[in-house]
Amino acid sequence: MLSRKIVLAVAATFAAMTAMAQCGKITGKIIDNGTREAVIHATVQLLGGDSAFVAGTVTDVNGEFAIEAGGNGKFIVKVSSIGYSVITKTVSVTGGMDVALGTLTMMPDAVMLEGVTATGQAKKVVLKEDTFVYNANAFRTPEGSVVEELVKRLPGAEISDDGKITINGKEVKRIKVDGKEFMTGDTETALKNLPTSIINNIKSYDEKSDMAKMTGIDDGNEETVLDFGIKPGMNKGTMANTDLAVGNHSRYAERLMGGFFNDKVRTMVFGNFNNTNDRGFPGGGGGWRPGNARNGLNTKKMVGVNFNYEEKDRLEIDGHARWNHTNNDTRAEQSAEYFNGGRSSFANSLNQSYSRRDRWVLRMRMEWTPDSMTTLLFRPELSTTTIDKRATGLSASYNSDPFLLYQSPLAPHAIEQMAEEGSIVSTSASNSIFYDNQKYAGATLLASRKLNGEGRNITIEAEASYNKGANEGMSLADTHLYGIINTEGNDSTYQTNRYSTTPTKSYRYSVQATYSEPVFRKTYLQVGYKFAYGHDKSDRSTFDFSKTGGDTFSGLAPAYRGWGQYLARLGNPIGTYLDNDLSRSSDYRSYIHEMQMTFRMVRGKYQMSAGVMLQPQRTRYRQVFKGISVDTVRTVTNFSPTFDLRYNFSKVSRLRISYRGTAAQPAMADLLDITDDSDPMNIRRGNPGLKPAFTHSMRLFYNNYIPRHQRAVMTFAHYSNTRNAVAQTVAYDEKSGARTSRPENVNGNWNANAGVMFNTAIDSTGYFNVNTFTMLGHNNHVGYVAKGRDAASVKNTTRTTNVTERLGLSFRNSWIEVELDGSLNYTHARNLLQEQNNLDTWQFGYGASTTVHMPWGMSVSTDLHEQSRRGYNDRAMNTNELIWNAQISQGFLKNKALTVMLQFHDILHRQSSFTRTLNSMMRSDMRYNSINSYAMLHVTYRLNAFGGGGGRGQFHGNGGRGGHGFGRPGGFGGRRRF
């Protein structure tokens, strides 16, 4: 009897699931009422009878769409696109039958199109809800340039020396092309290889994690995305772009790019080889960016392929494979001041390093939708990385500022003189060799099932990863202590000669389940549970040759993986030099349970969510170091509340306020009461009394767009405060120059920043445009300092205020663009313990740029900017640098497919490479070697065979003659997921 009931229950469940899977599909096509052309990437939403969101999609290149109803009943189809009036259509789905709406026409919105219709001038930026849409045609870039040059010109965008992209105060973590994944995890490849000539627009928005998109639960893992939209007509067919360049000072740059596109498949292949530090094109505007240093001489090589496949509403496959190689030659001069209680200590160093890096990466994403209620997502990844490095260095520490006496404090005569005066503490000469090899494999599997059309769903996610590494290193140092006398009455000297090997292993896995239940109308309760396990193992063996004699390794120069030449000079087998006190093995395991609950409301004007996460955590740490074996277990519970409110004033105006509290536990190694003096000049101690830290973080974001005046406004603010933050107490030994650090909990660490972006046309015709980006930041950094290893610690607070401003005024018509621009970065730092260390530094620049297009296909771009620094300790760094760049290009053949360009970088030989860092413990100024002044001759050839006419004759740099807005209305590129 019981078995019969079970069979009936299973049959009923199967029947219900089958019925749910029989969902009607609604199809249609959207066209422009005037041109009768397809409206591409229009937003199509399916709403229930109560206007609740059911499903969404965007139209394809033919203006067509298909959307699953998810059940029977009456629905509203809502179609919207920037530049058009919204259209709605009521439909009924019965018996799971498909519904064909046929062709729907969209009428242009007279208000939104007023600026473009009247003048034909391109709007620079349009805002729609949470998305910034930048018109690529409104930002002229030099012929043959890549999208990095385009991003530099976007209002509110910055690209740092290390390639980090920041836009509107947020770091860009992902690049997409037409809404599809592109080289995930590698923003540099897109910036350095995608040509601007194929880009129609750039979207900037925050994208939730895969888990959050499927469940609706905000897990705090949003990523800021730059989404490059391809020009209409260029998304079907084949294209190729070749750029070959040579220059003086042995500079070269070769870039190859090919693409194949059709309705289902998109394949792009890239190759890039250069020794110009991947430096962009000169001229064409954009102004100066503070801190635009060139850190060393870099040779970079890259080969990659990106693949996208889409079977509409059924299957998506995204993947990429790439090889990156980097050779680096860096000469770094550092000048540092350390805040030690009542007075400062100073240090200077000169280091020459060479490194090479090879990295292979394979990443894929597969999303399968067997029916409208079920989604499966799989993300595998494989990578291998090898790094080689060799370096030599010279450093010295002082008890007074050496620049007050000598322009070159590391010069032999300066060191000798300061030794007689007693102002120098120590010197050290070193060389080192390092090798590291890492292999990684990981995968994520995510499955989501809608249980009805009202918002009830369940999602399961599983992750696993494995990493195996091995590194070897050889380091030699010869240290001279001027304040310590040996038994013979001379200055104390000692050598530190060591070789180490460190194999490592780590693996992790986690399982997570979330469930969403509609509790009221458009109101949902979501709960989730996650278990995560992690295991990290390291076993460092250190061999000490410090007592073998000062001449054992004389005459040897560091070479990649060249420790064999050093080990060959040892008089005994290497095993006899093993130092158990310097060797260390560790085993770290973590067991984390995570429970979360989120309450979410969705209304016509706003969305609100509030939640809480509890995280019981058990960790076990085992270590053998200095002959001491430690086995410790820690059990803690972390707590994290969240709140998020999004209010839509209109389609182009939104306010967002969010809060998140996060708890963080001290590192287990910091909790061990062990002194690590393996580096005698930098000694570390543990602190078993450390408490967990808790950070409050609040954000505000507002944007608005006024189409009539082509005016965009954006403002943001962020505040963060950490209780029981971990800071390092640093004790300075005036005799030896050694520093002993110990972690301590501090309160008072907080930071805040706010920014405003404003972009508007000045005249009614849109020829004149002004844009400004202003940012104000303040950081309150607390630390402890002490003079002497056993001296009492003194609390030190450094308060730093930064003001950044970028202002540009431009004029543009069909053949010329002129821009006047200025930039300012002011730092106001106050040290409460030592007022003499208060700093006020300025970096500012101003100048002009212009681009002219001649009727016969010639283009000339140039810019002239004065860059200045003030307030730096080293007087040699308070400079004025007049930077002049220029480029001239001429197009040949049909549609200017062949272009010859001559570029001149830093014609006046005035640019330098300099950076500064500042916190409560120290300030540090760095200067690097670089080749900033050179000329390059480029030959570029473009071949394209596109299926649509839109791509032909338009394969030129952005903003070429006749650039018009965003193409036809509605052509805003990338696909957005719902």
List each language-model region with its residue ranges.
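Short, polar/charged loop or turn motifs at beta-strand boundaries
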Residues: 30, 131-154, 166-167, 177-182, ...
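Beta-strand-rich domain onsets/edges
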Residues: 15-25, 31
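Primarily recognizes Gram-negative and organellar outer-membrane beta-barrels
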Residues: 185-187, 208-250, 264-978
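Structural motif
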Residues: 29-39
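Short Pro-Gly-centered beta-turn/loop motif in secreted/extracellular proteins
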Residues: 39-40, 66-74
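Periplasmic plug
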Residues: 127, 164-212, 225-232, 265
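Short, acidic Ser/Thr/Gly-rich low-complexity loop/linker segments typical of extracellular
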Residues: 49-64
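Short, acidic, small-residue-rich periplasmic hinge/interaction motif at the N-terminus
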Residues: 31, 45-47, 78-84, 94, ...
